[in-house]
Amino acid sequence: TRWNCDWSSDVCSSDLRLAETVEVAPDRQWVEFTLREEARFSDGSPVTVDDVIWSYETLGTQGHPRYLAAWSRVDRIEATGPRSVRLTFTEPDRELPLLMGLRPILKKAQWEGQDFAASSLEAPIGSGAYVVDQVEPGRSISFRRNPDYWGRDLPLMAGVNNFDVIRYDYFADANAMFEAFKAGAVTVWRELSAQKWASEYGFPLMTDGRAVQAEIPNERPSGIVGLVMNTRNPAFADWRVRQALIEMFNFRFIN
């Protein structure tokens, strides 16, 4: 399931891929997914309810920590039909139906007799439009478009998956990635530091016009970078003290 969110209104809608339908209980106590009959893994084998249940249970107990917290709020998972699976929550939950719809589904047979939690460079068999192509441990991973992707003709897939190969390069830290951008190895950079924005963009890529420094307005929620005075602290209780600190704050020097 792919979820599309309008961050300005905090409303999300879903595009169903593996699932043909999704049903949520009126009291938000459970969510039920029905698989598309034509859903296939990249090796051509069908995606089954057993694969779905195994994926949820395995990722929820042995997968990335971000899966564990959500799984702890699931009371049980069960097949309700040859292509349907229901997850019942420990208590009514408005968020879990969305989170459960984002779980990757893996092929159970690929992992039989193996330790799922063990480190491995074996590429998992998935059901998406791309398959793992090449891996350079610690440096990069590339995905190749699957010409036999089962869902390529779904209406919701029109106009997407237009690249033959997608590559992700890894950097040890943000400074290394910024240096790669300055050298032209990275084509887009999102600057989060007001200080860098104002003082560190005089490198050749910018001065000769090969790169453009621009502000792109958007309506996504964002955090702040600044100082916040805790008025519950007696030191900041007097408004005149807070005003004095504001007057003393050298914004230009710090930024």
Question: What residue spans do the PLM features occupy?
Answer:
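N-terminal lobe/hinge region of extracytoplasmic solute-binding protein
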Residues: R2, S8-P26, E57, I125
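A structural "hinge/loop" feature
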Residues: S8, S14-E20, S45, Y67, ...
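Extracytoplasmic
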Residues: R17-A19, P26-W30, V47, S72-V74, ...
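Aromatic- and charge-enriched surface segment that lines or borders ligand/interaction sites
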Residues: E20-P65, T80, R86, Y170-F171, ...
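Surface-exposed binding/hinge segments that line
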Residues: E23-D27, T34, L68-W111, A129-E136, ...
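Solvent-exposed coil/turn segments that connect beta secondary-structure elements
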Residues: D27-Q29, R36-E38, V52, E57, ...
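Extracellular/periplasmic solute-recognition and catalytic clefts
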Residues: L59, R76-E78, D133-R144, D169-N233, ...
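Gly/Pro-rich hinge or "lid" segments in bacterial periplasmic/extracellular proteins
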Residues: G101-V160, D164-V165, A172-A176
